[in-house]
Amino acid sequence: MYKRQAYRFSFSWPRLYPNQDGKINSLGLEFYDKLLDTLQEKNLLPFATFYHWDLPKYLDDKGGWTNLDTLKRFSEFSNLIMDKFGKRIHSIATINEPWCVSWLSHYWGEHAPGMKSIEATAKSMHNILLAHGNAVEIARDYGHKNVGIVLNKTHVIPQSNKKEDAFAAKIYDEIHNTWFDEAIFKGKYPINLLSILRPYMPKNYSNDLKIISKKIDWIGINYYT
């Protein structure tokens, strides 16, 4: 029988901060304390994700990932996790699939908040990466040395050899793949997509790229067939 060595889970933001007053839910802390105790008893390494899409409703009502206040609150949430549980977590993923949080949710409208807005898309595509960078910094401040992010990838092929199809494929590759890769690993955004999104991006977005590109230890890949 295959012996499991690790358990991947996410911290639920609404469970720990159920209300907008910022008060911490002690029962939520107790839940994760017991979970980590159980994992230790079972000799399972905790692989924790800070954000796997469960945004508190009170933040969604104020614009969610298009609102900079959400980033401030996410940093508070990340700091709480590290303060209470950081030494007991083997591996940290800051964000699960930021493409889903941004493009899929704000341009295609298939996930919450179900928007179809290019402006909201541009802001969320940048802000979710800035939230990642802030979380990396927080984890480093607590001395953690096993920090990464999980990205979902897709293979893009032009429909034909026509120039317009090749360009369309390039744009979609930047939307789904290289927007996140280049920001995280190179501290820049791919030029073609940026030329489209720049009018809608947050002011002074380029100043954030140093934070977004903070060194990480690994990258997780989700690839669906």
Sequence positions of predicted segments:
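Conserved small/polar residues in nucleotide/adenosyl-binding loops
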Residues: M1-Q5
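Short hydrophobic-acidic sequence motifs that mark active-site Asp/Glu residues
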Residues: A6-R8, G220
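Glycine-rich, proline-tolerant flexible connector loops at the mouths of alpha/beta enzymes
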Residues: F11-S26
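Active-site region of glycoside hydrolase catalytic domains
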Residues: N19-Q20, D33-T225
